[in-house]
Each structure stands twice: as structure tokens, then as C-alpha cells.
Amino acid sequence: MIKNFFKLLTNEFSLMIKGSIFTFVLFCLLMIASSIFSLALRHISFDIEIPLAFLWIMIFFISLIKVEKVYASDFSEAKLQQYILSPFALEIIIFVKNIMIYLNLLILFFIFSPIILIILNINLSYLLSINILLALSLLSIVFISSMTSSITISRNNKLSITSVLTLPLFVPILIFSMAISDVIDIDINKLYIFFLAYFLLNLAFSPLLTSFALKKLSV
């Protein structure tokens, strides 16, 4: 069993590496979008909340696109049957796959984040806090995206429908991430605890609902 699990991890890690080019392209597009955003608002004075909200929304859509592409490729009807017949429950496979997607997105964000913050005119003193908050919130975003992506690829919906379905669950993440600007007035550890708790809440039902959607709607 341990050998099979190690083989599963190795296989998913290999798929993650192969998908890194697509993730790199997405973050290059994020840099372009950030540049356009900054140029459009260069004559307007605003607080950190506006560029931070823009960044989180863009990360939200990048995650949706990434998760949906991975699921469309890895959960085709033939591959799905192989996963179902594997020694592990589909929920475990979904969990491992989501973690690999998360690591892929997170590593690229850590690489690009200093440049993105400079482009968005966000003080680099926020770099560590933003990276930690993004690392915690991205966990929830990926698992939320997996639920809607499993429905989308099954029913052949479009990405716009996926974003609408996911948006209500993303709103708390967006709202609480804005509190980073009040880091002096609040305990930043409370924000970390919230994002961790929100992830655990999503973890409780996300793999189950994703597995159900893949099994029931893909046939």
C-alpha cells in the first residue's frame, strides 16, 4: 500500500512538473494584466486594498483556469475509470492532485510575487504577509475550484459558469485578505487562523463532492 501511494505521489508530481509551463504562462499573463491595471490607474491615488483585491481576484481566476485544465486532462472518461479501479479511493487521488496543483501555483507565485508587487505599487514590506496569506487562501481556492471544475468538465460548461458557481465561496477569502492593510491594528495571526480554518472546512466536503460529481456526472 505504501509503495502504491509513493507511486501515486511520483506520478502526480511528474504531471505537476509537466504542467508548469502552462502555469508559467498564466503568471506571465498576470504580470501583463497587472501592468495594464497600474497604467490605467497611474493618475489615481488609492490605498493598498484596490491593488490587493485585483491581485486576489486574478489569482482566483488563474487557479480556476489551472484546475479546470488539469481536471479536463486527467479526468477524461478513460483515465477516470483507471482512477476508480486503483487501490485508492477517488477522494484520496483528488486530494493529492489538488495539493500538487496548489504547490505548482504557490511556487510560481513566490517567484513572481516581488515583481508583481512592484508593478502594482504595493510596498515590499507587505511581501512576507501577502505570501503567507496567499499560501493559506490558495489552499481553499484550489479545493473550491476542484468542485466546480468537476461539474464543468462533466457538463461541458464554460469557464464563466464555473467562476459564477465558485464566486460565493471565494468572497470570504477576498474580504479577509483586505485586512492585511490593517496589520498594525489587528493580530495578523487571527487572519492566518481564519484562512486555515476555512481551508479545513473546505477540505471536509470538497474531495467528497468532487468525487461524487466525477463519478455521477462523467458517465
Report each predicted region and the residues it spans.
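Junction motif at the cytosolic side of a transmembrane helix
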Residues: 202-219
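A structural motif at transmembrane helix-loop-helix junctions in multipass membrane proteins
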Residues: 133-167, 218-219
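Hydrophobic alpha-helical transmembrane segments in multi-pass integral membrane proteins
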Residues: 170-184
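Helix-loop-helix units of permease transmembrane domains in multi-pass membrane transporters
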Residues: 70-101
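Hydrophobic alpha-helical transmembrane segments that constitute the membrane-spanning cores
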Residues: 95-121, 140, 144, 178
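Aromatic- and glycine-rich beta-strand/loop motifs that create alpha-glucan
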Residues: 1-26
